[in-house]
Structures are given as C-alpha cells and as structure tokens.
Amino acid sequence: MSALYMIVGTLVALGVLVTFHEFGHFWVARRCGVKVLRFSVGFGTPLVRWHDRHGTEFVVAAIPLGGYVKMLDEREAEVPAHLLEQSFNRKTVRQRIAIVAAGPIANFLLAILFFWVVALLGSQQVRPVIGSVAPESLAAQAGLEAGQELLAVDGEPVTGWNGVNLQLVRRLGESGTLEVRVQEKGSNVDSTHQVRLDGWLKGEDNPDPIASLGIRPWRPALPPVLAELDPKGPAQAAGLKLGDRLQSIDGIAVDDWQQVVDSVRARPGQRVQLKVLRDGEVLDVALELAVRGEGKARSGYMGAGVAGTEWPAEMLREVSYGPLEAVGQALSRTWTMSLLTLDSIKKMLLGELSVKNLSGPITIAKVAGASAQSGVGDFLNFLAYLSISLGVLNLLPIPVLDGGHLLFYLVEWVRGRPLSERVQAWGMQIGISLVVGVMLLALVNDLSRL
C-alpha cells in the first residue's frame, strides 16, 4: 500500500469527521445564542486562521488528532457585562445538553449521508456460496455443505460475505443457537440450519468468525505461480523468483494457492522444504518462514503472492438502490453499526471480547489508506464506520467526553442544581485517566500488529 494513500486517507478522514463533529457543537451553540470564540480543527500551532463577522476565530492547527469549539464561559475567564447572556454557563440545562449532544449527533448524520451515497453508487458483491466445510466443525455439525448459498443469518438477509461477517460478529463471545438459512446447490429449495455456540470465540484476539465456523467461501482456483515477492520477505531471501510454480511443501503436493496459504500460516518461524518448477526444471528450495502476530494470532509469513483471476459472472451480483430505498438502507446500517459498537464495548467489559481487538491511530491510518486505494465506495464506508465509532464513544458517560458532560447536565436537571465543582473536577480526573489508558492500550495493540 502506498504511503501517500495512507497519509492522505488519514488526513481526509480525520479532517472530515472532526470538522463535522465540531460543527455540530458550533451550529447549535450559535442557535442557542452562545458566543463562539474559536473553532479549531487540530491542536497545537495554528497553520491557518481567520475571523468571521461574529468575531469567531477559525483555526486549522498542526496536530490533526481532534478539534474543539471554545465558547464564552464565565468559569474560564471574566466576561464583560454586555456579553453575559451569550455565555455558555448562563444557558438553560436543556440548551447546554443540546449543544453538547450536537457533536455526536452530527457524526451519526454524517454516517447516514455516507451510507446513502454508497447505496446509490451500488457495489459488486460475491455471492456467499460455501466453498468447503471443515470436517467436525461447527458448520459441519449443523449440516452445512459445500455449494450452499447463505441467504440469511439470524433472520437478517445477506447478499455477500461482508454481510455474513457482520451478522456473525454480533454473536462473538455468546452461547446459544445461530440460525443460518441457505439455498441448496442447483435448486430453489431453502433450508434452515442451527449452529450451536458455546462461548463462541470468547476472548479471542483478532477472531475470524467465518473461518471459525469451519466455512471457507467459494472462490476460483488460483494456481500457485508466484506473481509478487516481498523484497524483504523469506521467499525473496530463499531465491524464489517470479513465475516459479510451487509443487509441494514438506512433501505435501499443492495445486492451489489456498493450500500454500494454509500450510504457511500453520508454520510460523519453521523451516520448510519446497519443490519448485522453474523453466521446466524442478528445484528444491529451503525456506525459513517469518512470524506475524503473537499468541494465538501467530502465523507464518512467506512474502509471496499470486496473480488474481476472473470471477465467473454467475458468482457476482450488483447491489444498488434508488434514492428513497437508499435512505432506508443508510438508516438501517447506521443503527446496526451503532448497536454493534455498543455491544462490542459491553462484551469487552465483560471479557467476552478481547481488549486486544481495540485499534488505535496506526490501524486507523492503515485502513484509511487501504480503503482510499480501493475506491470511493470503500473509503466512504470506512468514513461512515469511523464516524459512528466517534459518535458512540463520545456519548459514553465518561467525564471529559461529551457523554460525561451530558451526565453532569442530566444530574443537574434532576437535582435542580449542578454538582459541586469539586465533584466535577474529580470526575474529570477519572475520565482523563480512563481515556488516556484506553488510548495507550489501543496504541500498544497497534504496535503489536506491526
């Protein structure tokens, strides 16, 4: 992936999401008669600044990791008598709640807009047809077979593997029954299968829901002919060349690239013997595999790839919506992803999901770059998901976040008077500690994935 895509994708993502979030606060504050002193995108040294006719200073700062809206407030500085009514602290509790809630709400509205555009643009999806089912796996025990096409998971229709994965992610760490409706191969007959779950993937790092059921999606065969080599990878170091065809690994014949991938991933750090066909001659090559990940996520890495192949037209479907249908899709996806984000947080707190699944700025930058390089639709999807995460996280009742301020104002509304400044200060200290701790944990997780 190009570093340029990563940098540009990250800057665009943060710039758009932060600006929209802060604009929510700004717009409602203005409507409530609060004087806004500064609207800043980023922190630190201002790179660009200007003032509008209301005296608000607009700033684009050097560190693009957030932003803020500074409002007139007697608690922060002395306010001239003629401006007292424009102070944030002089507004009613309802007005203050509206101003604070407007930021996260803006993020949800932005996600709806992005999902609406994606639905209008349409996408080409691979039909979720099962390629193979591992013996004795959860899928095999439920009676699922190769050639069946998944139609719905837990009653939710699915049109592609992304939809399947989303529905499975919702069940991580749970016990019970997963209902899968499929269409039998070569017929229009539907059947429903019950997959038994028992603390499914509870606490697992980087879970792969589809693979863990024992399902491998159908895909065209890929001959194991090398078309890509990592200049610093084990394959290059061992002397493999573009055009080499792998015939066996440790004496086990391979005729499809997926066999190579499975074999390599299962041997992290091991030395393997390859038989390679090159220019009509069979060569023996010893190769020491690298290691990616840690713990249960450890896997072997070879540093080689093959060329893609054309998918049969019957295995692809175009999915798009009209303007009104797209609105429904956008609302539904935003609601679903918001609930999924909240559910994931709950499961992490209960230990049903590993905290190692938390991602920080490095992972965000990588995904931003990859999605930007992949196309407009993928990048807009990424922005929508990130905007939802920003909205949900900001609504958590943790002092220092918008949700913490909302909690204070709700308590004030119920009590008829605000909490003491000492209690609020304690809350802020606790909130800052929690937020910094989570940010450090996410950064450590990012670094462990490098």
UniProtKB/Swiss-Prot annotation:
It is a multi-pass membrane protein. GO terms for biological process: proteolysis. CDD domains: cpPDZ1_EcRseP-like, cpPDZ_EcRseP-like, S2P-M50_PDZ_RseP-like. Its EC number is 3.4.24.-. It holds the Pfam family PDZ_6. Zn(2+) binds at H21, H25. Keywords: Cell inner membrane, Cell membrane, Hydrolase, Membrane, Metal-binding, Metalloprotease, Protease, Transmembrane, Transmembrane helix, Zinc. Residues 199-291 form the PDZ domain. The keyword rRNA-binding does not apply. The active site is at E22. The keyword Hydrolase applies. GO terms for molecular function: metal ion binding; metalloendopeptidase activity. It comes from the Bacteria. The chain crosses the membrane at residues 97-119, 425-444. InterPro entries: PDZ, PDZ_6, PDZ_sf, Pept_M50_Zn, Peptidase_M50. Its cofactor is Zn(2+). It is found in: Cell inner membrane. Belongs to the peptidase M50B family. This is Putative zinc metalloprotease PA3649. It comes from Pseudomonas aeruginosa (strain ATCC 15692 / DSM 22644 / CIP 104116 / JCM 14847 / LMG 12228 / 1C / PRS 101 / PAO1).
